[in-house]
Regions:
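Flexible, compositionally biased loop and terminal segments
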Residues: 1-286
Length: 286
């Protein structure tokens, strides 16, 4: 099966990108830092809220595309713990926009067999938002298609702190002898327990930082950074990121296959191969 059988291209560029994609080598989990809504609006002399509304349209297209490509998991960074520092009017608008999105898009999400999950300190969100999130997760709980994970009131360091506190609670309840602290134990107590770690981390707006997002989980993720601001991140740009991902040789801290063969032939111990190269791809569009 070709990816073009899963997704009908809207134009020639999309058709060419789909031809390059191998449906058997798509990532299991794509995580996205959706950055640039405010700058998008400012460049057009519009209020920041206009950028956030445009960003919702981009998110809708990315969600639909990933679901049609049968990606198992997509995580979107929607609202960080630090975002509370923004002007009160902007924060209130973002909360209303989230509720509008859930009410409007939930039937489509459900129809496409997508399961909605929310990670973060949701107990600190407004009551109405919490209720709408709980209803949406309940209605999609039995869906077996793509998992759409929305990071709300989320921070990577806070997630690790919450995981460590959960492990301490486990020790208090069951005793230290029944617990072993290792990487798997930490993963099992994260908000994302049971989900695969991201294979591909996409960041828009050209910023070269991870912004306290999935700090534990992205240890071996491939990074794709594009200059596009989030509202301009189209389906073609997503396909471009997936094509780039499939060109990568994932090393997980080791040597590339070619270097590994050379080191073995020369009797080298390969110690330098423990330094993992980060791949930062820039798309100079826009």
């Amino acid at each position: 099966m070709k990816t073009s059988d899963l997704l009908k291209p809207a134009n020639r560029e999309e058709a060419e990108l789909l031809e390059k994609l191998d449906p058997k080598r798509l990532p299991n989990h794509v995580a996205v830092i959706m950055d640039g809504n405010g700058r998008w609006a400012e460049r057009r002399h519009l209020p920041r809220i206009a950028g956030h509304r445009a960003g919702v349209k981009a998110a809708r297209e990315v969600i639909e595309t990933c679901a049609r490509l049968h990606l198992p998991c997509l995580t979107l960074y929607a609202f960080s713990l630090e975002n509370w520092r923004r002007p009160r009017a902007e924060v209130d608008f973002l909360m209303r926009l989230l509720r509008e999105y859930l009410k409007r898009e939930l039937p489509t999400i459900h129809k496409n067999n997508i399961r909605l999950l929310v990670i973060g300190r949701s107990e600190q969100l407004p009551e109405g938002v919490r209720k709408d999130i709980a209803d949406a997760m309940r209605q999609t709980a039995r869906n077996t298609g793509m998992k759409l994970v929305v990071a709300l009131n989320y921070g990577g360091r806070a997630e690790l702190a919450d995981a460590f506190n959960a492990m301490l609670d486990h020790v208090r309840a069951n005793g230290l002898s029944a617990f072993r602290a290792d990487e798997q134990a930490i993963s099992d107590h994260l908000y994302t327990a049971g989900l695969p770690d991201p294979d591909l981390l996409i960041r828009t707006s050209g910023e070269m930082r991870v912004s306290n997002f999935l700090l534990w989980q992205i240890a071996y993720a491939e990074m794709y950074v594009t200059e596009e601001l989030w509202p301009d991140f189209s389906r073609a740009r997503l396909l471009e990121a997936l094509v780039d991902f499939q060109k990568r040789e994932r090393r997980y801290g080791g040597l590339s296959s070619a270097r590994g063969r050379g080191a073995a032939a020369n009797g080298a111990d390969g110690a330098s191969g423990s330094e993992r190269s980060e791949h930062l791809a820039r798309s100079r569009r826009g």
